[in-house]
Amino acid sequence: MHLSLTQQCLWPLQILLVSNLLLWENVAAVPTSDSGLGISELLTEDLFDDAVILSQHINGLAIETRRIFLSNNFSSDMFVKFTLQFNRHDEFVVNGLNSCHTSSLKTPKTEKEAKRISLPDFVKMILSILRAWDSPLYHMETELKSMTGAPFSILARVKEIEVKNKILLKRIIKIAKKVKHGIEENEEYPVWSELASLQSTNEESRFFALYKMSYCLFVDTDKVEHYLKHLKCRYFDGYMCQDPENQISLQ
């Protein structure tokens, strides 16, 4: 059969298109990384990576906020006073800092304890910590705005933590679906009940409420960061734990 000039030109192009389609099919059929993870697993890994990075950033902001509280003229006198009282084992300050509103949650203190918790329950614990800070962060920002002399550097960081905490919560809800944890709208979490102290007309009471919040916020953001690293390692059967960036140090 003789081909026209047009057909002769199109024939190589058709062969090329078919070859490319076969090539793409072969690419899709093999693992997409050296670790042997497929596309779905890689997307899940990205989700975990995003959550870990975000939690690290939030923890960093909490550390910065506490540092500014301790060094700024607005609050340093009161914060240094409470720190000295804590170092002297003053009963009021020690008891206050040992009663963060999330302390009712049974959280692991060691990696061995963490491994005894199922993945769904581990995700539930992280969600509870994040949800427990939704109201306190809002009121912390609101009260700081009304306090004379409150520095913008603190306000900006508290606001950023509040916003990023909500974003991280959404990320963890997506992760919860991966580990088969059914999300319930009315799932219980620790309730913060110290608004009266934060709004007190007594300056020392008000500043101690801020001192305690900044301390508890640091403790909990640090926990969330380490718990997410632990969760990531377990979800991917431990191979992630070989990376120094994912070494676990539970608080």
Swiss-Prot record:
Signal peptide: 1-29
Primary localization: secreted
Subcellular location as annotated: Secreted
Pfam (any one): Hormone_1
Iron-sulfur as UniProt keyword: no
GO biological process: cell surface receptor signaling pathway; female pregnancy; mammary gland development; positive regulation of lactation; positive regulation of receptor signaling pathway via JAK-STAT; response to nutrient levels
UniProt xrefs under PROSITE patterns: SOMATOTROPIN_1
Glycoprotein found in the keyword field: yes
Name of the protein described by the UniProt record: Prolactin-7B1
Organism: Rattus norvegicus (Rat)
Gene that specifies this protein: Prl7b1
